[in-house]
Swiss-Prot record:
Biased composition (Acidic residues): 165-174
Protein's name according to its UniProt entry: Zinc finger protein ubi-d4
Record InterPro entries: DPF1-3_N (IPR025750), Znf_FYVE_PHD (IPR011011), Znf_PHD (IPR001965), Znf_PHD-finger (IPR019787), Znf_RING/FYVE/PHD (IPR013083)
Gene Ontology biological-process entries: apoptotic process; nervous system development
Length: 405
């Protein structure tokens, strides 16, 4: 190292090297000053309590170099552990005051010396009026004001500025052992069973979402006509279904309040007439993506047929849905569902939607664990279900993807 320094000094010059060292020192001083504002602190990444130390020296500490190649030398300082005074005892934990007759008895028995010993000092306490509870805000530094009552000479309690590196990792740890895992053992029982029951009730209520026409039952004095029973995997689908299926009925009921009630048979026929063929929801006449209709697609400007969901009635242009020509022909052959209402074609449920795998030829949904054989991860590229493989043969998307690759 000394040879390297000598080579640098010879190459750049001693004055240039000194200036570079001064600039480096000034930069480090500014950096350390900024860091010292936040000291001490607990490093969240390493979990180590960062405190000040003796690494950083001042200019006044410099001395001449002692070895070859040394420009400066600094005095070595011995590491010293900070002395901690015992905190004042809580008066509530002290011994009760002793009556005079008891004091005389103890002196006779020899428990208390006549000249006053440490035992007498421990047994004697002040009245409760003169006691004051210790301030919890006191730290170890403020304990220097308390006198030392033992026979030893009084020692000065050092301040943090005297020893900057006294704070170490152990200072931030508690000395008392912690009892883990025992405090909450008694909480199990009725409370735990009640929490499990509440969680089960919430899960049954919200997952999956069922349409029971609750708005009409809560805010209308008339008895409910029927319960819809439609189920959805999330709230947006249920809200959309309610807005397009039941809200119009409630508005119609508000208008007909002044008219005599219609028979139940006629009312049920009117409700059935609002449903499409095979009990399907009436489709919307506009696209949810571009807000166009079958006469014009606002993205392309061309007329395009709408594809509607059989459960909620949402509609969309095939180009807005990014359908392929094969998929456009396939969705007309079965009860197509939008992404909000999509269910597994095998088990018929919409749970675990993160496990749903969609066919690239017909847009049907399948749980990966419902397939035969089951799949653990979605395949790369296109995927075709067994129905499309039997129908399209080699024209299926899975084979087209393999041919292109």
């Amino acid at each position: 190292m000394a040879a390297v320094v000598q080579n640098v000094v010879k190459l750049l010059g001693e004055q240039y090297y000194r200036d570079a060292m001064e600039q480096c020192h000034n930069y480090n001083a500014r950096l350390c000053a900024e860091r010292s504002v936040r000291l001490p602190f607990l490093d969240s990444q390493t979990g180590v309590a960062q405190s000040n130390c003796y690494i950083w020296m001042e200019k006044r500490h410099r001395g001449p170099g002692l070895a070859a190649g040394q420009l400066y030398s600094y005095p070595a300082r011995r590491w010293r552990k900070k002395r901690r005074a015992h905190p004042p005892e809580d008066p509530r934990l002290s011994f009760p005051s002793i009556k005079p007759d008891t004091d005389q008895t103890l002196k006779k028995e020899g428990l208390i010396s006549q000249d006053g010993s440490s035992l007498e000092a421990l047994l004697r306490t002040d009245p409760l009026e003169k006691r004051s509870l210790p301030d919890p805000r006191m730290d170890d530094d403020s304990l220097g004001e308390f006198p030392v009552t033992n026979s030893r000479a009084r020692k000065r309690i050092l301040e943090p500025d005297d020893f900057l590196d006294d704070l170490d990792d152990e200072d931030y740890e508690e000395d008392t052992p912690k009892r883990r895992g025992k405090g909450k053992a008694k909480g199990k029982g009725v409370g735990g069973a009640r929490k499990k029951l509440d969680a089960a009730i919430l899960e049954d209520r919200d997952k999956p979402y069922a349409c029971d026409n609750s708005y009409k039952q809560k805010h209308s004095l008339k008895p409910p006509d029927r319960v819809c029973g439609k189920r959805y995997k999330n709230r947006p689908g249920l809200s959309y279904h309610y807005a397009h299926s039941h809200l119009a009925e409630e508005e119609g009921d508000d208008k007909d309040d002044s008219q005599p009630p219609t028979p139940v048979s006629q009312r049920s026929e009117e409700q059935k007439s609002k449903k499409g063929p095979d009990g399907l929801a009436l489709p919307n006449n506009y696209c949810d993506f571009c807000l166009g209709d079958s006469k014009i697609n606002k993205k392309t400007g061309q007329p395009e047929e709408l594809v509607s969901c059989s459960d909620c009635g949402r509609s969309g242009h095939p180009s807005c849905l990014q359908f392929t020509p094969v998929m456009m022909a396939a969705v007309k052959t079965y009860r197509w569902q939008c992404i909000e209402c999509k269910c597994c074609n095998i088990c018929g449920t919409s749970e675990n939607d993160d496990q749903l795998l969609f066919c690239d030829d017909c847009d049907r949904g399948y749980h990966m664990y419902c397939l035969t054989p089951p799949m653990s991860e979605p395949p790369e590229g296109s995927w075709s279900c067994h129905l499309c493989l039997d129908l399209l043969k080699e024209k299926a998307s899975i084979y087209q993807n393999q041919n292109n690759s």
